[in-house]
Amino acid sequence: MATTTEKLKNFFAELRRVLLVTKKPGWKEFKMAAKITGIGMILIGLIGLVIRMIGYLITGA
């Protein structure tokens, strides 16, 4: 069974490995991700609005 110190060492070793593999996105990639995220947020909001309006029409409250 691993001790707390060994668990921490393993965690930081895995963290370091992940950080070495990752890279900073370019401006084009960042803009695309921001657009997709924004569109997703708007769609989720619109779906919630439609559900709320349907509920309002059904209950009449």
Swiss-Prot record:
Alphabetical list of Gene3D superfamilies matching this protein: Preprotein translocase SecE subunit (1.20.5.820)
Principal location listed in the UniProt entry: membrane
Stored InterPro entries: Prot_translocase_SecE_dom_sf, Translocase_Sec61-g, Translocase_SecE/Sec61-g
Xref: Pfam families: SecE (PF00584)
CC annotations in GO: plasma membrane
PROSITE patterns cross-referenced by the UniProt entry: SECE_SEC61G
Parts forming coiled coils: none
A GO biological process held by the record: protein targeting
Source species, domain of life: Archaea
Transmembrane segments: 38-58
Topology in the lipid bilayer: Single-pass membrane protein
Location of this chain's protein in the cell: Cell membrane
Keyword Transport attached: yes
Similarity field: Belongs to the SecE/SEC61-gamma family.
Quaternary organization: Component of the Sec protein translocase complex. Heterotrimer consisting of SecY (alpha), SecG (beta) and SecE (gamma) subunits. The heterotrimers can form oligomers, although 1 heterotrimer is thought to be able to translocate proteins. Interacts with the ribosome. May interact with SecDF, and other proteins may be involved.
Function: Essential subunit of the Sec protein translocation channel SecYEG. Clamps together the 2 halves of SecY. May contact the channel plug during translocation.
Protein name: Protein translocase subunit SecE
Organism: Thermococcus onnurineus (strain NA1)
Source taxonomy: Archaea, Methanobacteriati, Methanobacteriota, Thermococci, Thermococcales
